[in-house]
């Protein structure tokens, strides 16, 4: 039986800034992925592709019908599954997803994970609004469900999404196959493991209101407040913690309204006092991402990814789509083929070592920081210097002060990953 207990530790935080909240004419997206503390997150580049009509695509648990063309994507994902916690595509669409529990029960059986829906939307969409339509269409056709952790004990949930592109953002919140969405055309917004769309609904499932009325959750007369109507009546402690993180994140965004930059977002993701940078028992922030999506379509989008846990002791490394982009091998986990615990039935009966090269080096670096204060500080300074170099280079690029060859842009992430790996050697 699928567990849908919101008491189970699981948390994430997503943020977006749309001008005039941003300091520059760009939409800025950010996310912390909070997962089991030993789960490895890899960064995977998937090139654009063409596919045979009628072919099938294997996602984490089920197959779906493939489309004829897919876009290039960069994904930050738990290395055991097909989908992703967060990512971007070549058209400047970014998506992050989070766990949520509502009055709608979590369905039994395997379907699409919210993380599968995220990747499918990135591969098939050229705008945030189109990505929303892709997710809701797949949700209606295939549903969502299946174990969301690499563990024999079942643990399932529904999903919320923050979707952004160069011009706007959308919040999409689901309850089973039902959903509500809110469009953000200016200002800053965040989501944190709870329903947050109230009466300001920009789009919705056609049966959302009739379903709520049939269940006795809404009388059909008063204001239709999605979060109030579909949230659990008795909020457990875990959800109260999510509410506190949501409020803290909203306040951090409010304090920097009009001046939000990539660095500001990185600072928010590193905020430990609020719990946004999480390290609690068996869970922690396992990977982080910040994206700068310029409104000028002639400028490249820049995506910063850590590929390592704890953003306060990690390096945000720049990735830009373009010529010369290839997989950085140091952030790719080993594969186990048909013997992978996610592929064999019953699933997750054994464990495998999914640590990639950068993860191993970073793991050793964290140990050094805790054992030897002086050497640890030196190593952390190297991290900060490398990150600052990436920030300054990309700022120069967007300001027109740096015009490298296209192949150099495409290999930027690989170069920074290599240098970080060498720093840990």
From Swiss-Prot:
Q: Which GO terms describe its biological process?
A: proteolysis
Presence of the UniProt keyword Nucleus in the record: no
Q: Which UniProt keywords apply?
A: Phosphoprotein
**Record-annotated active site:** 12
**For this protein, what is any one GO molecular function term?**
dipeptidase activity
Provide an example Pfam family for this protein. Answer: Peptidase_C69
InterPro entries in the record: Peptidase_C69
Q: Which residues carry this modification: Phosphothreonine?
A: 52
Q: Name one GO cellular component term.
A: extracellular exosome
Instruction: Note whether Hydrolase occurs among the keywords.
Output: no
What the record says about family reads: Belongs to the peptidase C69 family. Secernin subfamily.
- Protein name according to UniProt: Secernin-2
Origin organism is Homo sapiens
Q: Which gene encodes it?
A: SCRN2
